[in-house]
Amino acid sequence: MHAPHAPVRPQWLAQVSEAPLDPNRAIIDAHHHLWDRPGQRYLAEDYLADIACGHRLVASVYVQCRSMLAVDRPEPFQAVGEVEYANGVAAYSASGVLGELRLCAAIVGGANLLLGDAVAPVLDEMLQRAGPRLRGIRNTTAWHADPRLISNPRPPPPGILLEPAFHRGLAQLQRRGLVLDIWAYHTQLGEVLEVARTFPELLIVVDHLGGPLGAGPYAGQRDAVFARWSADLRQLAQCANVRLKLGGLGMKVAGFDHHVASRPPGSAALAAVWRPYLLQAIDCFGAQRCLFESNFPVDKGMFGYGVLWNAFKRVVADFAEADKDRLFSGTARETYKIEG
């Protein structure tokens, strides 16, 4: 099995450092993780070190990654430990010790929606432990038959998004006013569309640009993938209940392979290769329904945090101020009900 993500190499990353562009613009990082895995520790202090690069981060959205599970509890309730941990980080930040930054201001937990109606007590306990900071749920759903296209340490089986039990779980999610985050590849956007049409009142956030693939059988097929991804994304955008996270292109499955170079890319280089994807996505959904994300530390194996945000800022430099405000903070604030 291929390692799902490029390894983080601090010395390699340190070769490129940039001053922040548009440094006073408020940013809500709509997607990051914290974990303590063997050889891959990335906790709050590590994230804080990354964001201390001059950009004005005002809040962040923590997204489930099977971190800090309550292993002494029955399996369905182990995911409660993760939201409890993230809420503790958020409480520390909310004390004002980090200035205006509200770390983990919104939390996307990992309750197993395949439990169907039985997920209800898990969701209720998560809400009890994390309170209003619990804003959504995400399950592991990105699947492809090719083993080179694995982006999760625990790959899911196929077809989860269409399972009747999963849909019963979605009904429980909707009943509680929670958001559904979905990470799926571009080959699965038809399944995402079916979910969006089946649950028109459920707010759905599609992660990582809808997963345009560039590795495995899609290596060297970028034009064909872009055409299919664009068409499916435009169809999905017709569902008013769907929003799109812009980012995640530093994963190996995206196929850009910045990690094999002797030096990490600068923001101008990233902007050049990302611009078609970002502009197409924004054209489909509009700035009102798009939100920028770092996907750190997953994408950290390819480029630095400050470089990432400079690349985003370069791509939308000519946008209206109101649209930039939506992309960098407003859409995330509205979607995940972040106060401030």
Give residue ranges: language-model regions:
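Mid-to-C-terminal alpha-helical segments outside catalytic/metal-binding sites
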Residues: 1-26, 42-50, 58-59, 276-291, ...
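Catalytic pocket-lining loop regions of alpha/beta-barrel enzymes
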Residues: 3-4, 155-291, 320
